[in-house]
């Protein structure tokens, strides 16, 4: 499922179903999309940045995937 997207100009779009998720899952999606403003891919650098801004991102990603 696609939870969010971010345009090159910085516009975020979030899946309306996300409102039912725990706030930390929402935070994960928003931070994930904002990291795409710096790295437009899912490479090593992208995940390093995501880990800096949200060290426990894997926990929230897994919870969202499991319960989303």
Question: Where is each model-derived feature located?
Answer:
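Walker B catalytic acidic pair
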Residues: 33
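Active-site-proximal or metal-binding-adjacent scaffold patches in catalytic folds
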Residues: 1-28, 37-68
């Amino acid at each position: 499922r696609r939870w969010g997207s971010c345009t090159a100009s910085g516009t975020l779009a979030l899946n309306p179903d996300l409102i039912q998720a725990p706030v930390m899952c929402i935070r994960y999606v928003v931070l994930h999309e904002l990291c795409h403003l710096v790295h437009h891919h899912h490479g090593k650098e992208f995940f390093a940045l995501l880990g800096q801004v949200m060290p426990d991102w894997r926990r929230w990603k897994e919870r969202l995937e499991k319960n989303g």
